[in-house]
C-alpha cells in the first residue's frame, strides 16, 4: 500500500513544501516550495542557517548607505539566499514574499518584486523558477497584473480568503493563488464555538468553490490550497491543482496508509451552476463585495499584520548584526 502522500500525488495534486527550513523538506520530494516572512524568521533562528544571514549581512555592508537601507538590503538578500538553497533541493519553483508593508501600494510591490528578481538573477537563477508572493489586496492584485503582463514575472497571490479575491486574481492573470484553509476554520470555530468535520470545514469549502469557479470558466491560474490545520483538510482537497503543506503534516501523510481518493475534479465543474462575476476593472465593486465577507476582511487584516510584524522582527535581528 502506498503512503497517503503518494496517493495524494496520484490524484493529480502537485505537492509543495511550506517551509523555510529547507534541510527538512527533501525527503518528501515536493515539486515546489513556499516561504513567507514568518517561516523565514523561524528558520533563521536555527544555528544551521546562520551562514545565510552572514551572507546577507556582508552583502548589505558592502552596499553601504544609511542603516535602514542596509537592513532592507540584508532582508531582500536573505530571502533570496533561502530561495537559492531551496531551489537546490526542489525541481520546480520557490515562492518569495514581498514585504507585507507594501500590501496597499501597487507601485512599491512591483518595484520590490523587480528587485528580488534582479537579486535572483545575480545568483544565476532565472525568473521562471520564482513566484513573487503578494497579498491579495486590490493593490496586490493590480501589482500582479502588471508583473505578469509587462514583465513576465509569475506571481502567487496569497492571504486569500474569498471568491472575490480569487476572481480578481484570475482576471489579473496571476500564475497561482494561495487560498487559505486553516485560518478560515480558525475564524469559524472562534465565531460559532462549533467543531467542524473535514467535510464541513469552511476552509475546505472555500477552496472547492474557488477551484470549481476557475475550472468552469477556464482560468489557467493554479489553485494552491494553503494553511492546513490537519491532514483531513488536505485529503478533502485531493485533486486540487497544488497543495502547500508544512513538513509536520507531510510527515504524517508519509507515515499514513489511509486511502486518499480524488475529491476535486475539474471535469465536473462545467456542469455546476456558478454565477460569473468581474472585478478587475471595478475597484469599488471589488471593495464592496469583499467587505461583505466579515471573515475574509478580518483574516486578511490579521495576515498582513502578522507577516509585517515578523518582517519587522527579522529586520531587527539583521539590524543588530549590522551595527
Swiss-Prot record:
SUPFAM superfamilies: Aldolase. Pathway: Carbohydrate degradation; pentose phosphate pathway; D-glyceraldehyde 3-phosphate and beta-D-fructose 6-phosphate from D-ribose 5-phosphate and D-xylulose 5-phosphate (non-oxidative stage): step 2/3. Its EC number is 2.2.1.2. Optimum pH is 7.5. It catalyses: D-sedoheptulose 7-phosphate + D-glyceraldehyde 3-phosphate = D-erythrose 4-phosphate + beta-D-fructose 6-phosphate. InterPro entries: Aldolase_TIM, TAL/FSA, Transaldolase_1, Transaldolase_AS. It holds the Pfam family TAL_FSA. This is Transaldolase.
